[in-house]
């Protein structure tokens, strides 16, 4: 039995949730998101909470039970508060700037890298060495942050590159004579 899945997902104040078959839709102050559950999961809206239960006790249904509940909880948090991911840039001459809606990165290449964010994602650059990616979809925010980090990931000797703000880089010692 899933300890995560058996807890109903409370609908926070200020959010309207609707359940139509396998689809949960959440509308809140930040926008609207939906989640479509697998056919092996049943969804019900009871007492201002979404109850997630497996249709049968197969291994496949039980494995999707807790994940479905967590995804529904994630869309509620997204439309209420949103998600954000902070990135830091380390290195001499490495910096970020906004160019309209696009992000312009100087990362030591012969050219500047211009990143165009997808619809629903906003990027802010409070300092030239700090990038904040925000949006309502947790998966999309993480994907965009990973794509930006991928341009120049942190290297282990000096730590130069783009890294997550909460990431700890394991440093290596340089070669000795």
Curated annotation (Swiss-Prot):
Pfam families: Ribosomal_L6 (PF00347). It comes from the Bacteria. This protein binds to the 23S rRNA, and is important in its secondary structure. It is located near the subunit interface in the base of the L7/L12 stalk, and near the tRNA binding site of the peptidyltransferase center. Part of the 50S ribosomal subunit. This is Large ribosomal subunit protein uL6. GO terms for biological process: cytoplasmic translation. Keywords: Ribonucleoprotein, Ribosomal protein, RNA-binding, rRNA-binding. Disulfide bonds: none annotated. SUPFAM superfamilies: Ribosomal protein L6 (SSF56053). One of its GO terms (molecular function) is rRNA binding. It comes from Rhizobium etli (strain ATCC 51251 / DSM 11541 / JCM 21823 / NBRC 15573 / CFN 42). Belongs to the universal ribosomal protein uL6 family. Signal peptide: none annotated. GO terms for cellular component: cytosolic large ribosomal subunit.
